[in-house]
Design a protein with these regions (language model features):
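Acidic catalytic cores of enzymes that act on phosphate-bearing nucleotides/polynucleotides
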Residues: 1-88
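Family-specific functional microsites
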Residues: 68, 72-177
């Protein structure tokens, strides 16, 4: 929001003459200015995300979305559900996260013999979710790393919905267990 506020302020100032009176811009010029400022907002945001280093909360998501920020912002479909956000960030019903915040004794997995219950294990490996995953793989392909998933869900709306469906089904079952 801070980047948008700064660019809106810059656009306002550019639309005034030296005495503060409004400059009459054509609709085409105004639209070009908005696009230019929007591009600067996204570029500034991307730079800040990528420069934030390894101390950034959500580093996994920043690494996956950062290079595709334009496409992420411009996608014409899909909002993030609570459960999609959990899978993307790893913050949610995962032993690794719950152990780290003191909600569970350790990070073990409750649905298979894996030693560490992470979002990536749930998304790409756990045999407990093989049926749910197969529908996802048919649309997105075998690479279910977060960067590959983000790329796929930004390419097609049906891929977005498949990922959303996987997250809803699997996380709701994990919550019920």
């Amino acid at each position: 929001m801070e980047y948008a506020a700064e660019e809106h302020s810059n656009m306002f100032l550019e639309s005034r003459d030296s005495e503060g009176r409004p400059i009459r811009w054509s609709a085409t010029h105004r639209a070009r200015q908005r696009l230019r400022h929007r591009g600067r907002i996204i570029a500034t945001w991307r730079e800040a995300l990528l420069a934030s280093g390894n101390n950034t909360p959500g580093l996994r998501v920043v690494g996956a979305i950062g290079p595709l920020l334009d496409q992420w912002v411009d996608r014409g479909w899909g909002g993030l559900s609570f459960r999609m956000t959990q899978v993307m960030t790893g913050h949610g019903n995962f032993g690794h996260f719950l152990g780290r915040i003191g909600r569970e004794q350790d990070s073990r997995y409750h649905h298979c013999s894996a030693g560490d219950d992470t979002a990536q294990h749930t998304l790409g490996e756990c045999p407990a979710w093989a049926d749910e995953r197969e529908a996802l793989v048919r649309l997105l392909g075998r690479d279910l790393s977060l960067p590959a998933v983000i790329t796929a869900i930004l390419e097609e709306e049906r891929s977005w919905h498949a990922f959303a469906s996987f997250c809803e089904k699997v996380i709701s079952q994990k919550e019920a267990a």
